[in-house]
Structure formats: structure tokens, C-alpha cells
Swiss-Prot record:
Originating species: Acinetobacter baumannii (strain SDF)
E.C. designation(s): 5.6.1.7
Gene designation per UniProt: groEL
Protein name according to UniProt: Chaperonin GroEL
InterPro entries registered for this protein in UniProt: Chaperonin_Cpn60_CS, Cpn60/GroEL, Cpn60/GroEL/TCP-1, GroEL-like_apical_dom_sf, GROEL-like_equatorial_sf, TCP-1-like_intermed_sf
Disulfide bond annotation, renumbered to this chain: none
Alphabetized NCBIfam families for the sequence: GroEL, PRK00013.1, PRK12849.1, PRK12850.1, PRK12851.1
Family membership: Belongs to the chaperonin (HSP60) family.
One cellular component term from this protein's GO annotations in UniProt: cytoplasm
Superkingdom field: Bacteria
GO MF: ATP binding; ATP-dependent protein folding chaperone; isomerase activity; unfolded protein binding
Reported function: Together with its co-chaperonin GroES, plays an essential role in assisting protein folding. The GroEL-GroES system forms a nano-cage that allows encapsulation of the non-native substrate proteins and provides a physical environment optimized to promote and accelerate protein folding.
Length: 541
């Protein structure tokens, strides 16, 4: 076991704060509409240019191990805020630094760190309640567009794209961000349910120009096993052929004699048919088959529940308005399922999302909700260079998360104004003792920090602006992009309440833990002897 270096009291805290300040100073230059870029060196490829706080924070690692501990703790603030709200990482870092630097003065003056922390926690609770009470719902196109624009560093085209995507696929829909191939940003929307399985044989394609199979008002047969024997399908095929409608078969697999017979019948025009493998694997496959069944009004033919394919009738089949099957994807548009059953299924999956602990599972469940409830929109980012593309994609990701947060908990005045206004909620608030009241005052001063930093980054005088904003009321604030004062909501400067709340809660949590730190322990690096000279190389001069 390696030897340890141990520091106590002020010497430990001063090292930790030095690390916090290095990281926070690097992150906070990106805050606000006039925030600056940070250029990050890469060991291979071009340097990465970003205005995304969490990206900057993740890159910082300090040589001094005690300082590095402080930096990593604040990095945790931005990561946690990013995970929960998707944005507000820079605000969280600025708040954590401000609370810590204000708090350390009181600790050095001999106050009880535990009582200071309790006071900070009381104040945070009061401010969070205030933010929740003043939040306004963001459910119209304009509000969503404004939140998206602000989070993408005042880029209105990004805000518009996100608002259009949300309008098309609904608030439950899945919106993904991809790198495009041109210079312009684009929005692709897939309505209905899409899953990543195409036709089993190219002979099922009936549109030769696009190599797709298009089925109008088809029947849909869902089977949760492999089909290799054509005899199992005969009765269903005959019943469907009599109606003159096409048939889509979704099964674990279709092979051998069954596949050959389907292909021949399709090519001869006896019955228009297409076979597709079921999406997903294992239990997820069963769940997705059930989703498709509910969406189309079908019954999954499963031997587990005592059903056999040979006895399937037209009543077991689902229907849809149109189905398009390509080499890689299947899209079901306007399934004929019962709306109440679909809503119930969505509710059921949402309950699973709440219970799930795995990020991957949650993402997959969210996709299933979107496929049932809305649709899928893809925002394709356009840029001239790869460096610009990466920087823009970071911003669009932030903006997308922020708009989702806004839809969830509403919006408040942006630009740090909501936090400055929350100072009024702390008026007259007292703790159980003097040290707790000092903790409340620490937070009262610290919550001005984001507005101060936004103003400083814009090249103006923070004290003058803070004073002017404090003298105003309601949503009156400072637009750092134009240098004007006015109603922040009318100027379209909004922050999601969830982002502001999460940033404050996480910043106060980590800063409180740092203030109550009395001892720090780290490994002492071992001095390894230099490698010996290479012998046996004489006569090489």
C-alpha cells in the first residue's frame, strides 16, 4: 500500500479552493450571450472549440492532487446538473464557486461549518420554492423557440428547428441530433412507428426505383417465433388473399420453405406480401411486438399463451393506413389500434421509466413511448468544417435538453434575473442560531454571481447592472446581448425553471460538503528509479 499525504483544516481547504477556482474560472468565461470560446487541445486531430460548460469541465485535470480533488468535486456539480436538466452547467459551476468563496470567509472567521451548511440548505429550499411559484408554463411554439435559442447561445435558427420538431412529434416524441452532410441545418420527421428492421428478402420490394415495399391498408400478422413451415401460414394466406389486401408478417424470422413460398406468391401477384424480422432481442422483442399489436389492433400469435399460427384468423390480424418497408427500416403509419389501449400502454411504459435505474433502459423505454405517442424527429446539423460541426452539435444538444426541461417545469426570467429576484424571498429569513443565519446570508450574496458573470463577459460593469436590476420589479432585467434593460420574458430571454433549480441545488450541495471538509488524503507519488542504460552497444560510434 502506497504512503498517503494528509492535510488538515485551512491548509486542506485552501488547496481545494485553489482547484475549484481554476476549473470554475475556465468554465465561467462561456456564460451568457457574449460568453467566450474555450479551445481544448486534442492529442490527435484538430483542437476542439466549445462554449459548453460541461465539456470544458470534463477536460480539466490538475497536477496537484489536492487541488485536483477540489476541481473534480465541482466538475461533479456540472455533470449532475447536465444529467438531470441537460443544461445550466456553467450556472451551477459559477454558483458553487460563489457559495464556496463566500462560505470559506465565515469558516476562517471561526463559525461552525455544519451550521453554515444548514443555513445554506434552508435558504436553497426557500429559493427553489420561490422559483417554482413564479415559473410560467412553456407550452406554445414561441416560448419553446425562445428557450432553445437562449440555450444554443442566442442562435435563433436552432431554437426554430427544435420548436418545429416538438410541434411535429409532440412533447413525448423522440428528437435526436445527428451530424448532417451539408452546410444547412435540416429537420427530418418520421410520423408513425419506425423500427430498425427491413425486409427479409429484396424480392419483397414492389417499388423498384426506391427499392421499398409499400403496402396500402395491409393486414399485419405478428408472430413471436421462427416460421419455416409454410403449412402453418396457409390458412392465414388464403383468408387474406380473398380480401385482396396486402399482408405484412413480423416474426422472429421467416426462412426455408416458408420464405420461398411467400417470395414466389408475391412475385406472381397472387398475394402482395412482405416479411420482416421483429425488432429488438429477448424480452425487449416481446415488449415491442406487444407495442405493435396495440398500435395496429392485432394479437401476437404466441405459443406461450396457447395460440397456434395454424389456427390464426383475420380477427387476430392488425391493420394500418400504410406501411413502408425499406432494406433497413419499417414505418407503420396510422395503425388501427384503440386510442384508449394505446394511452394505457404509454402510461404503463412511463411507469417503467420511473422505476428503471439504467440510463440505457430508460432511453429505450422513452423511444417506445415516442413511437406509440408521437413520432421521431432528427435534427441534422450543417457546418463548413468538422470543428464547427462538433461545437454546434454541443450547443444543439444543450438547447434540446433545455427545451424539454422548460416543457416539464415551465420557464422563469433568464439572464440570472430569477435568482436575483429570489433574494426577496430570503428577506427576514433566520436560522436557529447566528451561524445558520450567516449561512442564509452566504447564499443571498452568492445567487447574484451568475448575473455578475454574464455582465462581466459582456464587458459591462456588474455592480451597476446588479443595482439597476435590484431596483426593478418582476421580470425586469438586463439583456447582455444588446445592453438594454427591460422585461426579460418580452425580450424572449427565458430559462427553464428546472435548469435554474437544479443548478442551485447541486451547487449548494457540493459547496456545503466542501465547507464541512476538515481533512484531505491522497497518495504520495512514488519516485521510480530511472531506467538503466542499454548495454552491449559498444562500437556504435
Amino acid at each position: 500500500m502506497s504512503a498517503k499525504d494528509v492535510k488538515f483544516g485551512d491548509s486542506a481547504r485552501s488547496k481545494m479552493i485553489a482547484g475549484v477556482n481554476v476549473l470554475a474560472d475556465a468554465v465561467k468565461v462561456t456564460l451568457g450571450p457574449k460568453g467566450r470560446n474555450v479551445v481544448i487541445d486534442r492529442s490527435f486531430g484538430a483542437p476542439h472549440i466549445t462554449k459548453d460548460g460541461v465539456t470544458v469541465a470534463k477536460e480539466i485535470s490538475l497536477k496537484d492532487k489536492f487541488e485536483n480533488m477540489g476541481a473534480q468535486l465541482v466538475r461533479e456539480v456540472s455533470s449532475k446538473t447536465n444529467d438531470i436538466a441537460g443544461d445550466g452547467t456553467t450556472t451551477a459551476t459559477v454558483l458553487a464557486q460563489a457559495i464556496l468563496n463566500e462560505g470559506i470567509k465565515s469558516v476562517t472567521a471561526g463559525m461552525n461549518p455544519m451550521d453554515l451548511k444548514r443555513g445554506i440548505d434552508i435558504a436553497v429550499k426557500t429559493v427553489v420554492e420561490n422559483i417554482r411559484s413564479i415559473a410560467k408554463p412553456a407550452d406554445d411554439f414561441k416560448a419553446i423557440e425562445q428557450v432553445g435559442s437562449i440555450s444554443a447561445n442566442s442562435d435563433t435558427t436552432v431554437g426554430k428547428l427544435i420548436a418545429q420538431a416538438m410541434e411535429k412529434v409532440g412533447k413525448e416524441g423522440v428528437i435526436t441530433v445527428e451530424e448532417g452532410s451539408g452546410f444547412e441545418d435540416a429537420l427530418d420527421v418520421v410520423e408513425g412507428m419506425q423500427f430498425d428492421r427491413g425486409y427479409i428478402s429484396p424480392y419483397f420490394a414492389n417499388k423498384q426505383d426506391t427499392l421499398t415495399a409499400e403496402l396500402e391498408n395491409p393486414f399485419i400478422l405478428l408472430v413471436d417465433k421462427k416460421i419455416s413451415n409454410i403449412r402453418e401460414l396457409i390458412s392465414v394466406l388464403e383468408a387474406v388473399a380473398k380480401t385482396g389486401k396486402p399482408l405484412l408478417i413480423i416474426a422472429e424470422d421467416v426462412e426455408g420453405e416458408a420464405l420461398a413460398t411467400l417470395v414466389v406468391n408475391n412475385m406472381r401477384g397472387i398475394i402482395k406480401v412482405c416479411a420482416v424480422k421483429a425488432p429488438g432481442f429477448g424480452d425487449r422483442r416481446k415488449a415491442m411486438l406487444q407495442d405493435i399489436a396495440i398500435l395496429t389492433g392485432a394479437t401476437v400469435i404466441s405459443e406461450e399463451v396457447g395460440m397456434s399460427l395454424e389456427q390464426a384468423t383475420l380477427q387476430d390480424l392488425g391493420t394500418a393506413h400504410k406501411i413502408t418497408v425499406s432494406k433497413e427500416n419499417t414505418v407503420i403509419v396510422d395503425g388501427a389500434g384503440d386510442a384508449a389501449a394505446i394511452a394505457e400502454r404509454v402510461q404503463q411504459i412511463r411507469a417503467q421509466i420511473e422505476e428503471s435505474t439504467s440510463e440505457y433502459d430508460r432511453e429505450k423505454l422513452q423511444e417506445r413511448v415516442a413511437k406509440l405517442a408521437g413520432g421521431v424527429a432528427v435534427i441534422k446539423i450543417g457546418a463548413a468544417t468538422e470543428v464547427e460541426m462538433k461545437e454546434k452539435k454541443d450547443r444543439v444538444d444543450d438547447a434540446l435538453h433545455a427545451t424539454r426541461a422548460a416543457v416539464e417545469e415551465g420557464v422563469v426570467a433568464g439572464g440570472g434575473v430569477a435568482l436575483v429576484r429570489a433574494v426577496n424571498a430570503l428577506e427576514g429569513l433566520k436560522g436557529a442560531n447566528e451561524d445558520q443565519t450567516a449561512g442564509i446570508n452566504i447564499l443571498r450574496r452568492a445567487i447574484e454571481a451568475p448575473l455578475r458573470q454574464i455582465v462581466a463577459n459582456a464587458g459591462d460593469e456588474p455592480s451597476v447592472v446588479i443595482n439597476a436590476v435590484k431596483n426593478g420589479e418582476g421580470n425586469f432585467g438586463y439583456n447582455a446581448a444588446t445592453g438594454e434593460y427591460g422585461d426579460m420574458l418580452e425580450m424572449g430571454i427565458l430559462d427553464p425553471a428546472k435548469v435554474t433549480r437544479s443548478a442551485l441545488e447541486h451547487a449548494a450541495s457540493v459547496a456545503g460538503l466542501m465547507l464541512t471538509t476538515e481533512c484531505m488524503i491522497t497518495d504520495i507519488p512514488e519516485d521510480k528509479p530511472a531506467a538503466p542504460d542499454m548495454g552491449g552497444m559498444g562500437g556504435m560510434m
